């Protein structure tokens, strides 16, 4: 391959108003270092939990850290696909995206080390078949497919798995579980800070995935069917993951969590993505590039979570 030009020095320069570069600037402005999070109190809170509670929390953390490792490893083909399209802004953002995923892997490992969990945890995720299907089969297959087929349809399929199911349903539901555990009891302040920081990063990641699907749907309406079909295939698997995880604990789910609440939460986060993607149908591509609707959707989800957790705090305070 011979390089023939540089996008950064062409006439007009870069479009800093485009969504990918807005996300890039946002990530720079909100940089954080895992080493700055204080996990010192978490160890004492951890030891005060029951054995059953510690097992549940360890499983939840194992699912997160393995998932963060998986997405760190699997994102590279998307960068190559953006390069093939000549989209420097997206490439720039995805370098930051990959760095943040690696940082998330780091910080979950630091937390496990801080609370003294150093055992092999593979068995905890292997007991959840839907987790294995998504993270060991669907995710790597969809992203690896981009190495030989970086077409818009292949990109949409990859984004569905990565951005809309793994991040947009499973990760959000997991963060919500951590918040419910920590906020309800007033425990694990380091984990609370960790989840807050990661959640902020992930909102940008999900917004990029939504943007990518929207621009492909706007360019070719056939890609709407690709999105819709693959989401409808994977949403049941994502919901099954939640069901399988809770089923391991029978009628005595630790921390007083309720399966129905989390199934509703996960389903809601998945289904509301359809409208944001479909709203791009028939739109001019130039409009999509500077339309911040994807980021606004994630901010709406974050605001809703904040209100729900404020209500949990109020209820806990009233009970005491």
Curated annotation (Swiss-Prot):
Disulfide bonds: none annotated. Its EC number is 1.-.-.-. Mn(2+) binds at residues 68, 101, 104. There is a cross-link at residues 71-162 (3-(O4'-tyrosyl)-valine (Val-Tyr)). CDD domains: RNRR2_Rv0233_like (cd07911). One of its GO terms (molecular function) is metal ion binding. Its cofactor is Fe cation; Mn(2+). SUPFAM superfamilies: Ferritin-like (SSF47240). GO terms for biological process: deoxyribonucleotide biosynthetic process. Fe cation binds at residues 101, 167, 202, 205. Keywords: Iron, Manganese, Metal-binding, Oxidoreductase. Binds 1 Fe cation per subunit. It comes from the Bacteria. It holds the Pfam family Ribonuc_red_sm. Belongs to the ribonucleoside diphosphate reductase small chain family. R2-like ligand binding oxidase subfamily. Homodimer. Probable oxidase that might be involved in lipid metabolism. This is R2-like ligand binding oxidase. It comes from Mycolicibacterium smegmatis (strain ATCC 700084 / mc(2)155) (Mycobacterium smegmatis).
